[in-house]
Structure formats: C-alpha cells, structure tokens
C-alpha cells in the first residue's frame, strides 16, 4: 500500500479505509419480523420517491468510520465527501478502496493530497466490508418496516444511525 505514496516523503501514518454509498428514502422495505405468537404483524407501506444518500468510509482494522448525508449521488457530492474526510483525517495518509461507480472514476473527481484510491474489481461487493453496513442499518436501526412522514424524518433517523455506528466499532471491524 505504501507504493501508492511512493516518491513522497510523508511521515504520517497510513490507514486503509473502504468507502461505499447507499440510498435511503421514504419507500419503505417490508421485511420479516418477530411478533408475539398468535398475532400477525401489520406494516404500513408507502411509495414516495424521495431519497437521501449516505456516504460512509470504514477502517476495518480499527472500526473507525466517517459519514456524510447528501441529497444527491454524483461526483460533486463525492468531492464534498472526500474534502470532509481528508480534513478529518489530515494527520494520516489514507488508502481509500471503492467500487467502479461513475462518480468514483470521473475526471472531475478531486482527490485531496492525503488520499490515494484503489478501485476494487468489478462485480465484487463481497470485497468491500462497507457494503454490509447498509443491511445492518436497515435491519437494526429502524428502517425496515417503518414509514417516514417526511424526508427530514429519514435524514434524522439516518443521522442518528450513522452516529450510533461510532460507538459500535466491533460491528464495523
């Protein structure tokens, strides 16, 4: 990994992070759940197409994570994520692994000086540990089988869920 920074005299420690993004919105996901014996679960379903996007990077070694929420999913949003991430970890050299999404490979993508990227092979989400976070959030953090009255309510729940991940480092390792 140090080869990515070859030729640079930089004494900052090196950290490996994996990044991914996911869409959360007002279209709820109906899934299995446990209920008392002899009863039947009742879940409201809504079809409102309003979405937010969560960008998250995770260090599998330490369980550290960094997230932002964006109303769009494009290169501009990815640049904002990278800038905020680089500022938060400015005392480190970062290797950031991600998939081949268009906004990851765009010529308009601006990499901060302390971040180098590695692209994962195509069609291999199993290589990105961040992929599993989205299932965990949807199943354990009140997204499945819940309806949200507004997009702001989705944002509040998503922000709460992402903040809780900071205290759940063992889940992220």
Residue ranges and their predicted role:
Residues 1-79, 83:
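Extended, low-complexity cationic-aromatic segments
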Residues 5, 18-19, 85-88, 128, ...:
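A generic "structured core" feature
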Residues 12-16, 132-173:
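C-terminal anion-handling pockets and recognition modules
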Residues 17-19, 95-98, 118-121:
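Short beta-strand segments
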Residues 21-25, 60-63, 101-104, 123-125, ...:
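Short, solvent-exposed loop/turn segments at secondary-structure junctions
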Residues 40-48, 113-132:
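RNase H-like polynucleotidyl transferase catalytic core
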Residues 92-104, 128:
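Acidic/histidine-rich, metal-coordinating catalytic segments
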Residues 106-114:
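Short, aromatic/basic amphipathic alpha-helical patches
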């Amino acid at each position: 990994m140090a080869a990515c920074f070859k030729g640079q005299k930089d004494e900052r420690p090196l950290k490996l992070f994996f990044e991914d993004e996911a869409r959360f919105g007002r279209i709820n996901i109906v899934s299995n759940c446990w209920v008392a014996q002899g009863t039947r679960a009742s879940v409201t379903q809504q079809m409102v197409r309003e979405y937010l996007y969560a960008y998250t990077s995770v260090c599998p070694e330490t369980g550290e994570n960094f997230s932002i929420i964006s109303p769009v999913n494009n290169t501009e949003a990815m640049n904002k994520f990278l800038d905020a991430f680089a500022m938060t970890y400015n005392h480190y050299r970062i290797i950031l692994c991600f998939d081949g999404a268009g906004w990851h490979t765009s010529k308009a993508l601006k990499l901060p000086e302390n971040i180098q990227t590695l692209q994962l092979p195509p069609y291999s989400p199993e290589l990105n540990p961040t992929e599993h976070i989205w299932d965990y959030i949807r199943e354990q953090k009140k997204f499945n089988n819940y309806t949200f009255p507004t997009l702001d309510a989705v944002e509040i729940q998503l922000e709460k869920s992402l903040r809780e991940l900071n205290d759940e480092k063992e889940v992220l390792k």
